[in-house]
Amino acid sequence: MTKKKAYKPGSATIAQNKRARHEYFIEEEFEAGLALQGWEVKSLRAGKANISDSYVMFKNGEAFLFGATITPLNVASTHVVCEPMRTRKLLLNKRELDSLFGRVNREGYTVVALSMYWKNAWVKVKIGVAKGKKDNDKRDDIRDREWKLDKARIMKHANR
């Protein structure tokens, strides 16, 4: 008998929120599951997701993802109403929920979605506890990034 080959997909990442790292200081990251409908899973397999404006809100002791857009496919089911901007429940442990809820209420943090990816057959969302950056902080980050690139370029030419 032949051995079964391990399936290795190209990339597990579905969507990233690059703007979140630019606008916020990310203090801590959590991995959360996502409660989805069938048409949403099919759209995510096609890569039709956008989480650039998404954030997490708490209602009745549960966490929900707001602002994430999952565009339905043209061949989506006709008997189900496809709502792209629907709020989706995040699946977290009670301890994680309590920790996030406490930090948001007491310490003034916000919770933003950083990335959406596949983990085996499940869709996971990486969420981050974040604090907003001021304009001068953003400029400092840009300056540091540019200096890092210049330094690498200088070192490359110095070694020749």
UniProtKB/Swiss-Prot annotation:
GO terms for molecular function: RNA binding. The keyword Lyase does not apply. It is found in: Cytoplasm. It comes from the Bacteria. One of its GO terms (biological process) is trans-translation. Signal peptide: none annotated. One of its GO terms (cellular component) is cytosol. Its main location: cytoplasm. SUPFAM superfamilies: Small protein B (SmpB). HAMAP family: SmpB. Belongs to the SmpB family. Required for rescue of stalled ribosomes mediated by trans-translation. Binds to transfer-messenger RNA (tmRNA), required for stable association of tmRNA with ribosomes. tmRNA and SmpB together mimic tRNA shape, replacing the anticodon stem-loop with SmpB. tmRNA is encoded by the ssrA gene; the 2 termini fold to resemble tRNA(Ala) and it encodes a 'tag peptide', a short internal open reading frame. During trans-translation Ala-aminoacylated tmRNA acts like a tRNA, entering the A-site of stalled ribosomes, displacing the stalled mRNA. This is SsrA-binding protein. It comes from Yersinia pestis.
